């Protein structure tokens, strides 16, 4: 790796102690590509070595100290100059002096708190990384290594179904039902649509999974909606009394757990959007929020006791009632 200034005189490498056995997870980068990173959980220890290799053994490397940091950081893309750190740990590896030969320094961050899931979105990025720094008078030599953190949950104690009647007065009246209000990322959404009244010519019906990313606070709030999936549940005109089944597998889509008010910087919520299209290409829709969570039934053997406890947490939301009172889909709030 090349460095600014004195980068050509020394190479810095960060090695984890359990690199051979630790699982890797795919994570989307800022440019949309997927790469694999070492996977960690809340409460796990992060330990390893910082290796320094002199490119010219006959030259000495003077420095003002060597350190390694473990950092959890949120970056808002519209405010690139400011990085909001919610975890910042530092270990000094060497006092000011000279490096005369290649050597390695051990480090250990014990039971590190990693409260949030790694996330790369439309307007925000939450990342964890190790940063090794050789302080120099002019230019520091810096090496960073990103890791990925997953937040684990067990099955929520309360997980009521969602039932709702919606319609347009004297034109369309339907009842839809989803079997749960909270789904893990590999779950299956099971439900049904029942037509109580059909007086308009519906030709198509689908369910969309929508991710809504909210960043900022107060007047500087940005909302970004991304359609993750479109699932066709009907093609053709329904009749009164007809029931349409729903079975949507989540495992094939790029989803994250629901994230609410993360460090007071951003939120990520998911919605099921029921869309009906009539023969005149008018669109009617009804959105319903669902909670997504990462299943944590299998806990890594190498996880600490603290990490195992953390894996049992579930960040719930306001419970969704089993039955909703009928609501109307009007021209103003139901057509896209």
Curated annotation (Swiss-Prot):
It is found in: Cytoplasm; Membrane; Early endosome; Late endosome. GO terms for cellular component: early endosome; late endosome; membrane. The modification Phosphoserine is found at residues 302, 304, 319. InterPro entries: Arrestin-like_C (IPR014752), Vps26-related (IPR028934). It comes from the Eukaryota. Keywords: Cytoplasm, Endosome, Membrane, Phosphoprotein, Protein transport, Transport. Pfam families: Vps26. Transmembrane segments: none annotated. GO terms for biological process: intracellular protein transport. PANTHER family: VACUOLAR PROTEIN SORTING 26 RELATED. Component of the heterotrimeric retromer cargo-selective complex (CSC), also described as vacuolar protein sorting subcomplex (VPS), formed by VPS26 (VPS26A or VPS26B), VPS29 and VPS35. The CSC has a highly elongated structure with VPS26 and VPS29 binding independently at opposite distal ends of VPS35 as central platform. The CSC is believed to associate with variable sorting nexins to form functionally distinct retromer complex variants. Belongs to the VPS26 family. This is Vacuolar protein sorting-associated protein 26B. It comes from Pongo abelii. The gene is VPS26B.
């Amino acid at each position: 790796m090349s460095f600014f200034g004195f980068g050509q005189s020394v190479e810095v490498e960060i090695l984890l102690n359990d690199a051979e056995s630790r699982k890797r997870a795919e994570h989307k980068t800022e440019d949309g590509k997927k790469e694999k990173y070492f996977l960690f959980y809340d409460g796990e220890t992060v330990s390893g070595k910082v290796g320094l290799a002199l490119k010219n053994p006959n030259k000495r490397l003077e420095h003002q100290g060597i350190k390694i940091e473990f950092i959890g950081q949120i970056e808002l893309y519209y405010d690139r100059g400011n990085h909001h750190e919610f975890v910042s740990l530092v270990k000094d590896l060497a006092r000011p002096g000279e490096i005369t030969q290649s050597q390695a320094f051990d480090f250990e961050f014990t039971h590190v708190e990693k409260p949030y899931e790694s996330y790369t979105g439309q307007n925000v990025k939450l990342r964890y990384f190790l940063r090794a720094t050789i302080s120099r008078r002019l230019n520091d030599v810096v090496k960073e290594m990103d890791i990925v953190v997953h937040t684990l949950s067990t099955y929520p104690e309360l997980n009521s179904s969602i039932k709702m009647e919606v319609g347009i007065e004297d034109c369309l009246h339907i009842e839809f039902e989803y079997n749960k209000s909270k789904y893990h990322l590999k779950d299956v959404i099971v439900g049904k649509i029942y037509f109580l009244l059909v007086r308009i010519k519906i030709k198509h019906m689908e369910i969309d999974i929508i991710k809504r990313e909210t960043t900022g606070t107060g007047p500087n709030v940005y909302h970004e909606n991304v359609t993750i999936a479109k699932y066709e549940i009907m093609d053709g005109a329904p009749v009164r009394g007809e029931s349409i089944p729903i079975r949507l597998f989540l495992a094939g889509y790029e989803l994250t757990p629901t994230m609410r008010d993360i460090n007071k910087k951003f939120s990520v919520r998911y919605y099921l959007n029921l869309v009906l299209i009539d023969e005149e290409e008018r669109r009617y829709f009804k959105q319903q929020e669902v909670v997504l969570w990462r299943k944590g039934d299998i806990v890594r053997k190498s996880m600490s006791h603290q990490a195992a406890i953390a894996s049992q947490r579930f960040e719930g939301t306001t419970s969704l009632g089993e039955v909703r009172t009928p609501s109307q889909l009007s021209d103003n709030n139901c057509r896209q």
